[in-house]
């Protein structure tokens, strides 16, 4: 009987560890580490691997969160046109706080790829963005659902939802 309790306890402990391992072991990286290489940019959605879909999703989330560092609205507008199929400025202006953050870094947990078709996929993740705000390090946690499509041979965000925690 004691053996059974020990085995069950070990299984529960392992299950708890496994569910939190991503958050514990994920490390912050700078935005340049989330850029897409040329080979990946040239792939079609139907040929992307699961890992590559995550890379594309991470790229778009970091590009959106980078707006926290921007100093003028024209940069926000340009970034919106670069990322979104339409209405990019409206999406990004929500994250625009001029001169608020510096030295941003990003990490991701709970990444999932959902609703994969030949034309699109849905990327879900919890993103953490950390940076210097008024001389102190601040961290924000944001849940993202990003629908990625390829338009004119360029990956773009068709729609997204974000929830700040």
Please state what every model-predicted region is.
Residues 1-4:
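Positively charged n-region of N-terminal signal peptides that target proteins for export
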Residues 118-165:
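Exposed beta-sheet edge and beta->alpha loop/turn motif
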Residues 18-34:
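Sec-dependent signal peptide cleavage junction
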Residues 95-116:
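A short, amphipathic edge element
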Residues 64, 80, 111, 160-162:
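Polar/charged side chains located within well-ordered beta-strands of beta-rich proteins
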Residues 38-102:
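Core segments of small alpha/beta cavity-forming domains
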């Amino acid at each position: 009987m004691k053996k059974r309790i020990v085995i069950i306890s070990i299984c529960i402990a392992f299950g708890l560890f496994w569910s939190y391992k991503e958050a514990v072991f994920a490390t912050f990286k700078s935005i340049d580490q989330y850029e897409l290489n040329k080979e990946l940019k040239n792939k079609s959605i139907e040929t992307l691997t699961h890992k590559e879909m995550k890379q594309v999703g991470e790229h778009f989330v970091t590009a959106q969160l980078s707006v926290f560092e921007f100093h003028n609205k024209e940069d926000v507008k340009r970034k919106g046109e670069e990322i979104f199929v339409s209405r990019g400025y409206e999406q990004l202006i929500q994250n625009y706080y001029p001169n608020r953050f510096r030295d941003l870094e990003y990490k991701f947990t709970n990444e999932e790829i959902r609703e994969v078709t030949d034309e699109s996929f849905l990327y879900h993740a919890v993103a953490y963005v950390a940076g210097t705000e008024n001389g102190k390090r601040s961290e924000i946690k944001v849940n993202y659902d990003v629908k990625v499509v390829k338009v004119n041979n360029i990956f773009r965000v068709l729609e997204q939802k974000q929830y700040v925690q």
